[in-house]
């Protein structure tokens, strides 16, 4: 199973983002751009990669323990821009404010520690967490892109659950399935 742990967005929030994405779509008419489907939008906290079925109980236990330690996980977004920062643009992101990145970094550190304590093996990403939602992917690094894309989009929601997700890779793109949800307290 190809697994990751994420925060999913409420439908109301996705609808607001969808309106903003529809406004920027024409900018990319002459580019090979893949727009992420609305039903795939989420904030990945930890990517676990391929995990054997026998690891599932320990993964679920880790997520439950971690979610129970966090309350009021408020997610604030500030703009749509190219990503990743400081590198050639390969994506268009909805970026989180610094405070959101800091809070989610704290969540990620605790989650990763708990997974390791419970015997889960995965490739750790020790970079500082940068809260973002991938809206568009470019298959290859592109040369000239439409003028610098920074579109303010102030948007907030209260995350209610930390979710175990499975990624199904298909020729039409990845499809994500929620396997379990754990409430923040």
Predicted features by range, described:
Residues 1-185:
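Histidine-dependent nucleotide/RNA phosphoesterase domain, centered on the 2H-phosphoesterase fold
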């Amino acid at each position: 199973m190809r697994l990751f742990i994420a925060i999913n967005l409420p439908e109301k929030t996705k609808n607001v983002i969808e309106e903003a994405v529809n406004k920027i779509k024409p900018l990319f008419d002459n580019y090979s751009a893949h727009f992420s489907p609305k039903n795939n939008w989420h904030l990945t906290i930890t990517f676990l990669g391929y995990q054997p079925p026998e690891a599932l109980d320990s993964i679920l236990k880790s997520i439950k323990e971690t979610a129970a330690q966090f309350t009021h996980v408020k997610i604030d977004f500030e703009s749509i821009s190219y990503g990743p920062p400081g590198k050639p643009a390969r994506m268009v992101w909805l970026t989180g404010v610094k405070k959101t990145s800091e809070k989610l970094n704290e969540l990620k550190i605790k989650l990763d520690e708990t997974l390791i304590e419970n015997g889960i093996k995965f490739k750790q990403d020790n970079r500082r967490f940068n809260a973002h939602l991938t809206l568009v992917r470019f298959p290859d690094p592109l040369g000239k892109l439409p003028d610098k894309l920074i579109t303010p989009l102030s948007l907030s929601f209260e995350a209610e659950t930390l979710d175990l997700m499975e990624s199904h890779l298909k020729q039409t793109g990845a499809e994500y399935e929620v396997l379990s949800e754990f409430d923040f307290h």
